[in-house]
């Protein structure tokens, strides 16, 4: 990993550590509503259709943030392990699991180093979703983690935006759409963040780094590890 990539990962970890308490308290995530009645906040229909029946299955949730979706998967009957590199997020996830009484294991780890953190683990399902890939500087170790973590016959589900989604000017208020960012990444993009997507008014300023990955890179990294597309 290059020096700028290492700097970016460290800065992003600081960002998620700073964001986590604001997210736990936000209306966006409605944690208190989930604690009061977990069954009232199931996965949306698209996620349920993609992931299918997980009852009794060993499931690994990569980049799980503070575990809300991980616990939704536990509620659906999965035997879940959630992984995130933010110590604040993992601490909050463990508190949330205790408050709801839902069984879950949470591991603090960079997903690219997970084979060292959970040696020999084998999961029926590996899952990751929504805005996760752009936080990773290199998809090859990520794909290796996915392959290492799957049991024979296991399935990997990834739900994320198409890479072309990220090339347009997200600050433009009027049409037409304008290309602002590169599709073919050559190092990270650096942004100063005020608040967050879930808590826009939060009094927190952070710096994020984002890496562009082409569709070919995403699929190719997984195929190179022996996965196949169903």
Please place each PLM-identified region on the residue numbering.
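A short glycine-rich, Lys/Arg-flanked "PGG" loop and its adjoining helix->strand segment in the class I
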Residues: 140-155
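Class I SAM-dependent methyltransferase SAM/SAH-binding core
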Residues: 57-114
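A short acidic, Gly/Pro-enriched loop at the edge of an enzyme's catalytic core
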Residues: 116-126
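A short SAM/SAH-binding and catalytic strip from SAM-dependent methyltransferases
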Residues: 124-140
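Short alpha-helix
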Residues: 208-230
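Conserved class I S-adenosyl-L-methionine
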Residues: 1-55, 68, 72, 155-196
